[in-house]
Amino acid sequence: EMTRPLKELTEAAQKVAGGNLEVNIDCESKDEVGVLADSVQQMVNHLRHYIDYVNEQAYTDALTGVANKAAYKEYVDKLDKRAADEKIKYAVVVMDINNLKKINDNFGHEFGDMLIRDASRLIQKGFKDHIVYRIGGDEFVIIIEQAEKAICDELLRNFDDGIVVFNKNNTKYEQKIQIARGIAFYEPDCIDSFASVFREADHAMYENKVMQKSMQTAPPAAGQS
């Protein structure tokens, strides 16, 4: 009668040793075998939670809490394969915080980090249904699968409006947050790779950055001061 529970426990232990942590040991025995089975199950549960925690840390940006560059690279590799096989379409949004180096030089990196966190929260709020990746000091990427241009345009308009509202109501510091953004689309049957779509979005972002900076330095219109 002890043979069957021991056999099940042995099989479960072998699965765990092979890397399968999705095991549930169902042993109703109240003897030493049952105690051992419960202990092994607890060990598996703890190990599963620990691995989940390690994975989360490995793919999370420490400063902002968004997905990091490692998560971004892994997702992009999978997306390139899926785009070819499944004929999906997607949009790539590239964002860059304006004047971050100047801000760090003038106010210090602690202030710069606070501004990055605030910018990250604005991006997450504007694209709350999508994963935000921080891939550089001041650079963020959002990938929108099954993207429709009209919906993406609305997301960007709302995002821009959100920055205006934040800067108007922000009492923590006088420095205004400015985030340049660009977008590009990948369509099914397109021969482009993710890298080429990213380059297009990155170029659009730099054009937006130039426009924002020119608006900053432009003289006031007649009747304005």
Set out the residue ranges of the language-model regions.
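Signal-transduction coiled-coil helices of two-component systems
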Residues: 13-16, 20, 43, 79, ...
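Flexible, glycine-biased helix-capping/connector loops in cytosolic signal-transduction modules
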Residues: 12, 17-22, 86-88, 98
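The cytosolic transmitter module of two-component sensor histidine kinases
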Residues: 2, 29-36, 112, 152, ...
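Catalytic-core segments of nucleotide cyclases and related cyclic-nucleotide turnover enzymes
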Residues: 109, 149, 153-160, 170-173, ...
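Amphipathic HAMP/coiled-coil signal-transducing linker helices
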Residues: 21, 49-68, 78-81
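Amphipathic coiled-coil signaling helices used for dimeric signal transmission
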Residues: 11-15, 22, 26-53
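Conserved long alpha-helical elements within nucleotide-processing catalytic cores of c-di-GMP signaling
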Residues: 55, 68-91, 98-125, 133-137, ...
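Cytoplasmic juxtamembrane amphipathic helix immediately C-terminal to a transmembrane segment
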Residues: 1-14
